[in-house]
UniProtKB/Swiss-Prot annotation:
This is Dihydrofolate reductase. It comes from Staphylococcus epidermidis. It holds the Pfam family DHFR_1. InterPro entries: DHFR, DHFR-like_dom_sf, DHFR_CS, DHFR_dom. Residues 2-157 form the DHFR domain. It comes from the Bacteria. It catalyses: (6S)-5,6,7,8-tetrahydrofolate + NADP(+) = 7,8-dihydrofolate + NADPH + H(+). GO terms for biological process: dihydrofolate metabolic process; folic acid metabolic process; one-carbon metabolic process; tetrahydrofolate biosynthetic process. Belongs to the dihydrofolate reductase family. Transmembrane segments: none annotated. Changing F99Y: Trimethoprim resistance.
Length: 161
């Protein structure tokens, strides 16, 4: 299994505000779709509820401690240990609590860095480049629908870190 994080955060590591993305960036949504289609997404219940439905053409797995949680098209797990039992390419999709729990266990991270500062109430955990090697860094294209400067980073964990 390959275990990755996929996330977008601003310069202050904001990832959300009131259970929504604080920005609208279609390029990032397209990037996420390209990377995750055909693979597995693991997300917390609050993240799933903010999306409202399973993302198509992916296995959607929701981690929750609520025994009553059920949703068509979603597999439910109740512990972090169950993530290790998944196969294929598994993307940790959020939110904050799941990122905090998994950042030290993932092989790599796909991060869209939003070049701005947004109001937020959820954050991506701190990370340093001494633990991560930049595999790629691509500036996002700006146009009438994508007006916020952004960079797509792929970071790979350094050996022994």
């Amino acid at each position: 299994m390959t275990l990755s994080i996929i996330v977008a955060h601003d310069k202050q590591r904001v990832i959300g505000y009131q259970n929504q993305l604080p920005w609208h960036l279609p390029n990032d949504l397209k990037h996420v779709k390209q990377l995750t289609t055909g693979n597995t997404l693991v997300m917390g219940r609050k993240t799933f509820n903010s999306i409202g439905k399973p993302l198509p053409n992916r296995r959607n797995v929701v981690l929750t401690n609520q025994a009553s949680f059920h949703h068509e098209g979603v597999d439910v797990i109740n512990s972090l240990d169950e993530i290790k039992e998944l196969s294929g390419h598994v993307f940790i999709f959020g939110g904050q609590t799941l990122f905090e729990a998994m950042i030290d266990q993932v092989d790599d991270m796909y991060i869209t860095v939003i070049d701005g500062k947004f109001q937020g109430d959820t954050f991506f955990p701190p990370y340093t480049f001494e633990n991560w090697e930049v595999e790629s860094s691509v500036e996002g294209q700006l146009d009438e629908k994508n007006t916020i400067p952004h960079t797509f980073l792929h970071l790979v964990r350094r050996k022994g870190k």
